């Protein structure tokens, strides 16, 4: 689609019009518009580094997972672009009801504000994963499989990590035993699928674990877990202050690890309607002071759940290789 044919402003207006409407209200978009978003944003991703070097102030958000109403709440809280600069840590699609609206608004903002709005790749921005967990079905139901493949081409070009003011390392999952130098990330060629093992896989899939020293097996059946010692060594070696990552549900929307050397952000409150978690967003000011803005879980959703708030649901989901698909 030629640049002139994609009216990003019109699309953003439509996507924001559902604010205040009943949650889940579908936004009408044409296939040509959505395809245009994928093609144009892909060009921008490829024109920018795979390892982004960003400057504060900015706001950092974790997983969204198709919870479009909550994404709009985040922007209401943090300021709609370009009022604030944003970095999202991946996992835009799957599981929630409105992956299409979610990813389309994010891509539209990327096109409109390419130097102020940044998106990293999560493990769900990968065909083999979002084929299973909802995005493929949503694309097929509302458009067609060809459009899902166009999204795959776009996702294969997303940046993988970011460093804020040379001090805060950001990625979706975590560290890798293969990561010795930042140059290794810069050398990853795009477009690329996410391999089953190795550096790119680990950056999108690994998890911190307080019970591990060094590297451990990951219950997900993919990548590794890493201990506080690994975090400290990594920060020292690269003269960094903090690792900021997403990838796991945390009760308060953010959770520290390794004496505040790592923080997990998760920005989808009431995740999947199954958890009573809050959603968190981290604001980094010009002095690199970090503060947290929290979207509380809504009581309303919780009361419809079997057993109510005291049913003893775990804070984080069991991390199996193939979690059951909720239907």
UniProtKB/Swiss-Prot annotation:
Positions contributing to Mn(2+) 1 binding: 63, 65, 91
Regulation: Inhibited by the toxins okadaic acid, tautomycin and microcystin Leu-Arg. The phosphatase activity of the PPP1R15A-PP1 complex toward EIF2S1 is specifically inhibited by Salubrinal, a drug that protects cells from endoplasmic reticulum stress.
The protein, known as: Serine/threonine-protein phosphatase PP1-beta catalytic subunit
GO MF, any single term: metal ion binding
Keyword Cytoplasm in annotation: yes
Gene giving rise to this polypeptide: PPP1CB
Function summary: Protein phosphatase that associates with over 200 regulatory proteins to form highly specific holoenzymes which dephosphorylate hundreds of biological targets. Protein phosphatase (PP1) is essential for cell division, it participates in the regulation of glycogen metabolism, muscle contractility and protein synthesis. Involved in regulation of ionic conductances and long-term synaptic plasticity.
A biological process from GO: regulation of circadian rhythm
